[in-house]
Amino acid sequence: MENNTSLQQQLLEAGVHFGHLKKKWNPKMLPYIFAEKKGIHIIDLNRTVDHLQESAAAIKQIAKSGKKIMFVATKKQAKEIVSECAKRVNMPYATERWLGGMLTNFNTVRKSVKKMQSIEKMLADGSAESLTKKERLTLTRDKDKMEKVLGGIAQLGRLPAALFLVDIGHEHIALSEAKRLGITTFGMVDTNCDPNKEIGRAHV
């Protein structure tokens, strides 16, 4: 109980309890709304803590089994911290933009990753020295462009076991692809979202 209170206090201090304006709400979020204040919905942090703990336990089991959980956060305010956290735990991530087909067309995406890695190798081992300066510059630009989008999944040799979406509304394409392939999803849900769109969920 003490741990729950401590977590709830941290969420409160971080402003996690603030939802969207009432006029933007999704009625399916009613069970997770505590109150309304000045036209803004206040999220029930008791429910948030319950779902966070439930999701954390499920994610821990997936990671423990050696499977990969892919973190997705393309919103400007979340991308940096999410990529840092994903790198820290050696998990794949997508934080620049979701490349359509990243899951549903995974084999083709893997070919692009291999091309990126091949260019990186050429530039690193001196193979590119035989090229003209202009050709090397083009290669470097191509590599940088691909790395921005594909760098986070460079070591992902097969489809991830689960996705963690920082905002299921914003990452709806990733969510749709995961659902089509039966990949478990965990997501942060605001008061303007449909909480039934994903399997595991943390209502934030």
Map each language-model feature to its residues.
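N-terminal cationic and glycine-rich segments that engage phosphates or anionic surfaces
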Residues: M1-K68, T74-K75, K79-M122, K133-R136, ...
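Nucleotide-binding motor/catalytic cores of P-loop/tubulin-like NTPases across gene-expression machines
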Residues: H170-E198
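Conserved small/polar residues in nucleotide/adenosyl-binding loops
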Residues: A202-V204
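Short hydrophobic alpha-helical runs that function as membrane-insertion/retention elements
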Residues: I69-M70, P92-T95, F164, T184-M188
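Short His-Asn-centered micro-motif
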Residues: V72-K75, L165-D167
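Glycine-rich phosphate-binding loop
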Residues: Q155-A178
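Short gly/ser/thr-rich secondary-structure transition/capping motifs
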Residues: K143-L150
